Curated annotation (Swiss-Prot):
It comes from Nocardia farcinica (strain IFM 10152). The keyword Transferase applies. This is Aminomethyltransferase. Its EC number is 2.1.2.10. GO terms for molecular function: aminomethyltransferase activity; transaminase activity. The glycine cleavage system is composed of four proteins: P, T, L and H. It catalyses: N(6)-[(R)-S(8)-aminomethyldihydrolipoyl]-L-lysyl-[protein] + (6S)-5,6,7,8-tetrahydrofolate = N(6)-[(R)-dihydrolipoyl]-L-lysyl-[protein] + (6R)-5,10-methylene-5,6,7,8-tetrahydrofolate + NH4(+). It is an enzyme of class 2 (transferase). Belongs to the GcvT family. It comes from the Bacteria. PANTHER family: AMINOMETHYLTRANSFERASE, AMINOMETHYLTRANSFERASE, MITOCHONDRIAL. GO terms for biological process: glycine decarboxylation via glycine cleavage system. The glycine cleavage system catalyzes the degradation of glycine.
Amino acid sequence: MTETDLLRGPVHDLHGELGATFAEFGGWQMPVAYAGTVGEHQAVRTTVGLFDVSHLGKATVAGPGAAQFVNATLTNDLGRIHPGKAQYTLCCSADGGVIDDLIAYYVADDEIFLVPNAANTAAVVAELAAAAPAGVTVTDQHRDYAVFAVQGPRSAQVLAALGLPTEMEYMAFADAAWDGRPIRVCRTGYTGEHGYEVLPRWADAEPVFRALLEQVRAADGQPAGLGARDTLRTEMGYPLHGHELSREISPVQARTGWAVGWRKPQFWGKAALEQEKAAGPRRILMGLKAIDRGVLRQGQPVLRDGEPVGETTSGTFSPTLKVGIALALLDTGAGLEPGAEVAVDVRGRRLRCEVVKPPFVPSRTS
């Protein structure tokens, strides 16, 4: 895919004005960094950062019984929440592989708003549309809404300055307005910090982003690119589809079984996942913290006593811990517990690492 083939978000030119460097994410050209990933990461941990994640998908399932239909297909149990709350969930295939992980917003019994990953939106919409009963529609709204994430300890201060709602529980959302423009405000995020995701209409994106940026800077924050978003989520052990989740990596292996409604009568992949859970997965997601100096990356062999016992799925330098960290799928048969020492083959060099159970840093989402 060439640069000219990449899709662009609603404030792409503004990112250029801000000095962003760009990279491809899910078929979209998105800002990877502005002043620098480490500084942007630290801003989110200490003050506040503003991300443009408008490449994320958006879709609406609507019609009589929409919530019931979504509950019978996606893994998590919508019965655990109510209108005004959101839920992390997964769209699985019959064999238990993950087509995508996504957020489901319970708007009403007849309306569920979904935010899938950019590259998987079309697949999720197609799967749901093909299975939808009469009267239930599944509409791809990828370019109807922008998504801006305001994340960090001062995120509430930023939204309050614009008159947007901030007093809500984690994973709650509210429909509001700024300057006459409708905005959905969600107490969600992908950083492990207190934060919000703000969804204005696509056409309203630039004035909303500029207003948020002004308040972020007033709070000693800065715009942050998707490079920082990745280091932040890796520190939290949050999975990224294509890395820790895929059609070959199940929720049981990726430690996202908490997002599966095991007691529900049905959801896609239920039989396969129940079987894997009962038997025990052949591999499990763990964290690795480098003992030796070095940076870990995806796809590197993990060794114990020179024998392969797994592979890294994501890796980075942790700006918080100031060491290399990784997420890795480790063979359960190897019996590796937190505290065990392994080695990662980094281009022929054996980098010693300690096995840890994620997250690497405490969550502060509440």
